[in-house]
C-alpha cells in the first residue's frame, strides 16, 4: 500500500467538508497517512475531525510514496521545499484563491483521488533553480524564482549580472528576479516578464522597477550559470527563494543554475497549460 503524506494550511470553514471527504476516501482505501503537525491541528481544532493516521510529521519522511498538498500556491511552494531533492511526486489540491500550481480543486478531489490510488495518473516534471552563495553554505532550491531585493525602501541597489562568466549588465533597480518557467507567471510576471511554457528549458531575468527604461526582461537557456553581485548603500540585501527570505551582506555573490533534480507533479487528468492561462489568468478574455 502506498504511503501518503499530507501537508496543508488553515482554510475557510466552508471548505471543511471537501477536505474531510478527501481524507475519509483515503482512510476507506486503507491508505497509510502521515499528516503535517500544523495541518492536523487545524483538522482537529477547527473542523473537529480526527483522522486515523500512522504518524504526525514536521518534515517529509523518506519512506513516503506520494505527497498531497492542500492549499494555494504558497502552500504548494512550501511543500515543494519540503520535498527537496527526494523527487517524491506531489499532488496539489487547491483550497486557496488562484491555485496556479495545483492540479485539482478541493470540491472535486475526493472524486478524483481514486486515480491516484489506482496509479492512473501522469507525472509532469518542473525544473528548479539551484542557488549557491559564495560563503560556503549548501545549495538551496526554488521552484518559482530567486529574487535579489533591496533591504531599505529609500534607495535602489545595483545587481551586476554575468552569464557563464560573461558580463551582462548592471541592474540599477529595486531588485532582480530570476524565474523558472513555473515562476514566469508569478513575481516575474508582475515585473512585465514573459510567460514561459512549463516544458521550455529557459530562465528569465526580470528587473523590478529598473532605473533605466532600456532594462527589459531577458530570457536565457537554463543551462546558463548566472552569477549575481550586489552593491547597496545599506551593505545588505535580501535573497528571497519562493518567499523564503534571508538577509545577506553585499560581499556575498550568488550563483544560480538549473538544479540536477526536478519537481514531479501528479496530474490526475489531461492538463492543458493554455486552458490554465485562460481559466486562472483570464488570458485573452474580453474584460470590459
Curated annotation (Swiss-Prot):
Q: Which catalytic residues are annotated?
A: 73
Catalytic activity reads:
NAD(+) + ATP = ADP + NADP(+) + H(+)
Residues the entry annotates as binding NAD(+):
73-74, 78, 144-145, 174, 185-190, 209
A GO biological process held by the record: NADP biosynthetic process
Compartments, record wording? Cytoplasm
EC assignment: the record states 2.7.1.23
**NCBIfam families in the record:** PRK01911.1
Q: Which family does it belong to?
A: Belongs to the NAD kinase family.
Q: Which cofactor does it need?
A: a divalent metal cation
NAD among the record's keywords?
yes
Q: Which GO terms describe its cellular component?
A: cytoplasm
Do you know which InterPro entries this protein is assigned to? ATP-NAD_kinase_N, ATP-NAD_kinase_PpnK-typ_C, NAD/diacylglycerol_kinase_sf, NADK
Annotated protein name in UniProt: NAD kinase
The alphabetized UniProt keywords are:
ATP-binding, Cytoplasm, Kinase, NAD, NADP, Nucleotide-binding, Transferase
Task: Give the protein's biological function.
Answer: Involved in the regulation of the intracellular balance of NAD and NADP, and is a key enzyme in the biosynthesis of NADP. Catalyzes specifically the phosphorylation on 2'-hydroxyl of the adenosine moiety of NAD to yield NADP.
* One of the record's GO molecular function terms: ATP binding
